[in-house]
Amino acid sequence: PAKVVYFGYGVYPISKNDGAARNQIVLSVNAHGFLNGQPREYYENLKNGELKGYAFNEKENQDPETTYFNGMMLRLIRSLEYVKSLPEWNGKDLTVEGHSQGGMQAAIAAGLDKDVTMAIPNQPWMCDMGGAALGHLRGNWHIKPTAALFYYDPVFHIRRYDGRLKVLAGLGDYVCPPSGMAALYNNAKGPKEIVYTQGAGHTGNAKGEK
């Protein structure tokens, strides 16, 4: 089996996850095009310079080809291609998972790659971006919706996926409201479940009544 893990918003290095790599391949993926394993100053310079506020640039977000998410999703596709090329992969079990921005990537990965068999988006970001115009809840940390960004809404991508899906939602999450997770769940075609945690904020490891 193989698992590909994606991570939340930010400018930081990604390290390998040996703890999860028991009896399976685990690939932890950096959403960006920079190097891992560099000195702290390397990431601080990117965080305060080139990548400051990445993905929030309104001009870039007018075109699906120029938005920051374009490169992010190309890296996502390549990560899956790489894992599937490994001779150790059994050729049939492929899981994608992640929290927040990583949850968004996991849901989109499921829609883009027909070989994904299990998707676990945990409080995924960017779900139901156009929903606010219809009176749906909107997170308090959101990107201004544009027509171009709808290409990157996980709610649409999940329609292409018919594998197993487990969505995790926090009922106290004001960054990625659970209504967006419900829209994602409702659009999925295959075997699916959604787990709501009472009072849970945008933690990624929600504790409380399920």
Feature-to-residue mapping (PLM):
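Primarily recognizes the serine-hydrolase "nucleophile elbow" in alpha/beta-hydrolase
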Residues: 12, 16, 78-140
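Active-site nucleophile loop of the alpha/beta-hydrolase fold
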Residues: 31, 120-130, 154, 199-200
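Active-site loop signature of alpha/beta-hydrolase-fold enzymes
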Residues: 13-14, 34-36, 127, 203
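C-terminal catalytic histidine-bearing segment of alpha/beta-hydrolase fold enzymes
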Residues: 182-210
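Hydrophobic/aromatic anchor residues within beta-strands of the central parallel beta-sheet
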Residues: 26, 119, 194-195
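Short beta-strand element of the alpha/beta-hydrolase
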Residues: 1-10
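Cap/lid segment of the alpha/beta-hydrolase catalytic domain
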Residues: 20-74, 131-134
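The feature captures the conserved acid-bearing segment of alpha/beta-hydrolase catalytic domains
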Residues: 130-188
